[in-house]
Amino acid sequence: MQEDLELGNQNFPMVLVQIPMYNEREVFKLSIGAACRLIWPLDRLIVQVLDDSTDPTIMEMVSTECGKWATKGINIKCERRDNRNGYKAGALKQGMRHSYVKTCTYIAIFDADFQPEPDYLERTVPFLIHNPELALVQARWKFVNAKKCLMTRMQEMSLNYHFTAEQESGSTRHAFFGFNGTAGVWRLAAMEEAGGWKDRTTVEDMDLAVRVGLHGWKFVFVNDVSVKSELPSQFKAFRFQQHRWSCGPANLFRKMTMEIIRNKRVTIWKKLYVIYSFFFVRKIIVHFFTFFFYCFILPTSVFFPEVNIPTWSTVYFPFMITLFNAIATPRSFYLVIFWVLFENVMAMHRTKGTFIGLLEGGRVNEWVVTEKLGDALETKLLPQVRKPRNGFLERINSKEMMVGIYILCCASYNLVFGKTVLYIYLYMQALAFIIAGIGFIGT
């Protein structure tokens, strides 16, 4: 883009930056400020704040912040609606209806806790300009609070593995992967061709990506461009997030399988990749297998000595995932064993969410905004965050405790009566469940 500066601002495409938010008291200034500091000609940039807040105080604060940047010459719009239908997808859909959006060629989307670097557009938009077959440029995430507690370290490892093993490989092999919902730049024409945002599931980002991919568009994941974000540091918030991230894809798989099969625009190999690898294996089978095998079948097998589970089957998958994780997050290598155990704990919630999504149960469209702490992370204001009076009791998670106690009993039985050393793994897995059960894994 630097070579185009001499040609004047008109050579730059119009870019819309969307920031959906809902009562984001702690982080709204960070995201709005970062968006307004993006290096791009002011007359070719529109910042659209989609504020679904219901708290009048926060609404006033957001309006004031938008007004502050408007006085500095930023073309910033603060858009609100009189309902929250469709949650984030509904807000994005409503935001696209404004007339000024039609003047834009590309749309960058950032959640309220994301802070792009000033050169973000300069490093991503050229991919779309010079590759007309591209619909999406996705950047990776980096985390401002990864070292906050053990749980945030575990999340960093999981997400780094996701970006390396799923996003980067999908981009390289098939030019397709799931949009992460933020830190990406879309081509408006591709979005419109695929039908725009839909609120039929809680994973509107994945829904849009699949539909755009089925229209023959390609995606690219840019590993060396990263956007700062915040990880949930409270276990309850993390569980709600994981429920949404597992329930939504399963529900989308239920709704889109036949649509993918009937599609005539892409090859059968790409359809097979989307149905089998992207959805069936990664979004459904992996959760079921992880929880039922490692947290139920394997522990229960100690009561049935005639059942012989091959050692390789219990070691191969954890070993390979651990190897990939060590490559993705080398500084956390010493935590990989507990990370595998923690992933097994979370597999319980992911399995439940997947069942609800496949069966369209009562919580299938549940959307709980992930709680964020924003500046409190850097200014050491955490003690001022309100805590429940019965702090310890509030932290107890009964499901994790029950599973942990069951695996503990299995481990003890194997130690006393068994002829294998399976109890070593079972004791460690039970400890991981109990640590999560008493709430000692987050802030």
UniProtKB/Swiss-Prot annotation:
GO terms for biological process: cell wall organization. InterPro entries: Glyco_trans_2-like, Nucleotide-diphossugar_trans. Substrate binds at D111, D113. It is found in: Golgi apparatus membrane. The active site is at D52, D205. GO terms for molecular function: glucomannan 4-beta-mannosyltransferase activity. The keyword Membrane applies. The keyword Glycosyltransferase applies. It is a multi-pass membrane protein. Keywords: Cell wall biogenesis/degradation, Glycosyltransferase, Golgi apparatus, Membrane, Transferase, Transmembrane, Transmembrane helix. GO terms for cellular component: Golgi membrane. Its EC number is 2.4.1.32. It catalyses: GDP-mannose + (glucomannan)n = GDP + (glucomannan)n+1. Its main location: Golgi. Probable mannan synthase which consists of a 4-beta-mannosyltransferase activity on mannan using GDP-mannose. The beta-1,4-mannan product is the backbone for galactomannan synthesis by galactomannan galactosyltransferase. Galactomannan is a noncellulosic polysaccharides of plant cell wall. Belongs to the glycosyltransferase 2 family. Plant cellulose synthase-like A subfamily. This is Probable glucomannan 4-beta-mannosyltransferase 11. It comes from Arabidopsis thaliana.
